[in-house]
UniProtKB/Swiss-Prot annotation:
InterPro entries registered for this protein in UniProt: CcmF_C, Cyt_c_assembly, Cyt_c_biogenesis, Cyt_c_biogenesis_CcmF
Function statement: Required for the biogenesis of c-type cytochromes. Possible subunit of a heme lyase.
Segments crossing the lipid bilayer: 8-28, 43-63, 94-114, 122-142, 176-196, 211-231, 274-294, 312-332, 352-372, 394-414, 424-444, 448-468, 490-510, 616-636
Protein name, entry field: Cytochrome c-type biogenesis protein CcmF
Native species: Haemophilus influenzae (strain ATCC 51907 / DSM 11121 / KW20 / Rd)
Any GO BP annotation: cytochrome complex assembly
Keywords from the named record: Cell inner membrane, Cell membrane, Cytochrome c-type biogenesis, Membrane, Transmembrane, Transmembrane helix
PANTHER family recorded: CYTOCHROME C ASSEMBLY PROTEIN-RELATED, CYTOCHROME C-TYPE BIOGENESIS PROTEIN CCMF
């Protein structure tokens, strides 16, 4: 009965989304206020119907209704309740339902929080989001329905959720990532609405920017959590593998970052209009591309869902319609919104333009590096591999000038400026950067590499120029402490985000260059050394869970003879899925991680273990959190705060 309720709710949501896609847009085109007024109630109805469907799937997992095929494939009577509930989005069908429900959440938020906008603008934006919803609801109903019954079979138990996904990271990572993906549909809808009317001004940028920031914050948090999840769950000691599906989330993040900076120019100066619209289209298109890569079956990845060709063809067709249609509209109407003024050679606008060029260069590198091997293979030309060394080298080249721009850009005035105004502080900061770039790796790790020097230089120049810019802004008209308190949330957000980039670069530079890995065979009581750290293997005890059996190894770590930490690494065997999993143990800190992964028991009663020393690796994720916090502060700046907008 509940499964049928979920099906009926999906069918109702299809009908409502079709009406939302037609009537408000028709009303906006004809100037019919009554039809435009239907946009909000239809959006509320779409949200309600999809919420019922989503709640129904939650209930079916909670009670383990094995008459539903999706429950059979992803749950089991031994699976803990918190993993049962998060298994709702643990596979293809449920994750698609999560996608369209989150799309309804974003639509609901736009309808609720945009009462200050003109009725025509709201009708167009919600109508476009209705069109997007139609495509995905059709996809779920006819190719990926999570409510399909098992009849005439009646299984008494299920196959279990993939053990790799039985982790707290699964509870939060996919919803955060999807909130980011789907959130860019709002920026996309605003962009298409502006193309339809041929009007785009500073007010449009001010309406669109908080929604873009919100999507970017969620996507940043999703990527950060996914990277952390891979680090501790997969047992490889790595945090980013340039996997095609990882790249498919990174590409819209790069486009979204460029869009945020471009929107600031459109809002402040009325420039970059056509380029900003194109970036909004690109960001959401890349989100759709990522969906195609994950669900088409053309990838072999720890992230990819097994899928049949029908699903891949549907998404490809949907991709062509949405991207092709939006680009065709852009080609037809783009000239009507194009900016007529040109930025001066040395101005804040030109700095942000260079920023966008470098971000787009990075995006092209990831795009080509990800898709070229796939296209090459699909064309029958054989397999080629583009691995981490290519991406690492290219990003080192791109990030070096980007870091300098990140520091100098906020110091430059809008419209026109002279470099002589900031020459002295920039020269001093560059001088300090050159010294620190060599000194920091040498004094902290006793050796120097090219990439560690460049990484240290990038970190130092971003941080120094950000602090100098803070001092200049705060003391422009007031004393420092008075001026600091008067700075806007947007300014603090910008500074935190830029410092977050510096922290992440620092963590990457040191963890990539100075990590130490050892594969060892150890018997009880034996020790292995990494630098000044001694890892002593004290034995393995049984460690069984509700749906697995396994062993837990204790490793005592000392530094220069003094106790440092005791780690407990596990090896689990999941009895239903017949899979083995490694649960790494980590002693974390701001300056280093000590990481142990337990392998197999060997014939001579020794155990295989993998030991890691990873300096400053946590700065990668701390920097990501700073970026997200910066975006959040910008989003709630006085100009954009939703509670202020609601009062207008």
């Amino acid at each position: 009965m509940i499964a049928e309720l979920g099906n009926y709710a999906l069918a109702l949501s299809l009908a409502v989304s079709l009406m939302l896609a037609i009537f408000p847009l028709w009303g906006a085109e004809k100037g019919n206020a009554q039809l435009m007024a239907l946009a909000r109630p239809m959006t509320y109805g779409l949200f309600a119907s999809l919420s019922i469907a989503f709640a129904a799937l939650f209930y079916l997992f909670a009670v383990n209704d094995f008459s539903v095929q999706y429950i059979v494939n992803n749950s089991n009577t031994t699976l803990p309740i918190y993993y049962r509930l998060s298994a709702v989005w643990g596979s293809h069908e449920g994750s698609l339902l999560l996608w369209i429900w989150l799309l309804a959440v974003w639509s609901f938020a736009v309808a609720l929080l945009s009462k200050h906008l003109p009725q025509e603008a709201v009708a167009r934006v919600l109508g476009i989001m209705g069109i997007i919803s139609v495509g995905f609801v059709l996809f779920v109903l006819f190719t990926s329905n999570p409510f399909t019954r098992t009849f005439p079979d009646f299984p008494v138990d299920g196959k279990e959720l993939n053990p790799m996904l039985q982790d707290v990271g699964l509870i939060f990572h996919p919803p955060l990532l999807y909130m980011g993906y789907v959130g860019f549909s709002v920026a996309f809808a605003f962009a298409i609405a502006s193309l339809m009317t041929g009007k785009l001004d500073s007010a449009w940028a001010r309406w669109s920017r908080p929604w873009t920031l919100a999507a970017w914050v969620f996507l940043t948090l999703g990527i950060v959590l996914g990277s952390w999840w891979a680090y501790y769950e997969l047992g490889w000691g790595g945090w980013w593998f340039w996997d095609p599906v990882e790249n498919s989330s990174f590409m819209p993040w790069l486009a979204g970052t460029a869009l945020i900076h471009s929107l600031s120019v459109t809002e402040k100066r009325g420039s970059f209009k056509a380029w900003t619209v194109l970036l909004a289209i690109l960001a959401f298109s890349l989100c759709l591309l990522g969906t195609f890569l994950v669900r088409s079956g053309i990838l072999v990845s720890v992230h990819a869902f097994a899928s049949d060709p029908t699903r891949g063809l549907y998404i490809l067709a949907y991709l062509v319609v949405v991207i092709g249609g939006s680009l065709a509209l852009y080609a037809y109407k783009g000239s009507q919104i194009r900016s007529r003024d040109n930025a001066e050679r040395y101005s804040r606008e030109s700095m942000l333009l260079l920023n966008n060029i470098l971000l787009m260069t990075a995006l092209c590198v990831v795009f080509l590096g990800t898709l070229l091997p796939l296209v090459h293979k699909q064309l029958g030309l054989g397999s080629i591999s583009i691995g981490a060394p290519f991406f690492d080298q290219m990003f080192l080249i791109i990030m070096t000038p980007f870091a300098l721009l990140l520091g100098i850009g906020p110091l430059v005035k809008w419209r026109r400026d002279q470099f002589s105004a900031i020459r002295t502080p920039v020269v001093i900061c560059v001088f300090v950067m050159l010294i620190a770039g060599f000194a920091l790796p040498y004094f902290l790790q006793d050796k120097i590499t090219v990439s560690s020097v460049l990484g240290s230089m990038m970190t130092v120049i971003i941080a120094l120029l950000a602090l100098y810019e803070l001092q200049q802004r705060a003391t422009h008209r007031e004393s420092f402490f008075v001026g600091v308190r008067k700075l806007s949330r947007s300014h603090w957000g910008m500074m935190l985000a830029h410092l977050g980039v510096a922290m992440t670069v620092w963590g990457i530079a040191f963890s990539q260059n100075f990590s130490v890995e050892r594969d060892v065979r150890m018997k009880v009581g034996e020790s292995a050394q990494i630098g000044r750290y001694d890892f002593k293997f004290t034995g393995v005890t049984d460690e069984n869970g509700p749906n697995y059996i396994g062993g837990k190894a204790q490793i005592d770590i000392s530094k220069d003879g003094q106790p440092e930490a005791s780690l407990f690494a596990e090896k689990r065997f999941y009895t239903v899925s017949r899979m083995s999993m490694t649960e790494a143990a980590i002693a974390g800190g701001l300056t280093r991680d000590l990481y142990v992964a337990l392998g197999e028991k060997l014939e001579d009663n020794s155990w295989a273990l993998r030991l890691y020393y990873k300096p400053f690796i946590r700065w990668i994720w701390i920097g990501g959190l700073f970026m997200a916090l910066g975006g959040l502060l910008c989003m709630f700046d006085r100009r954009y705060r939703f509670n202020v907008l609601l009062k207008k």
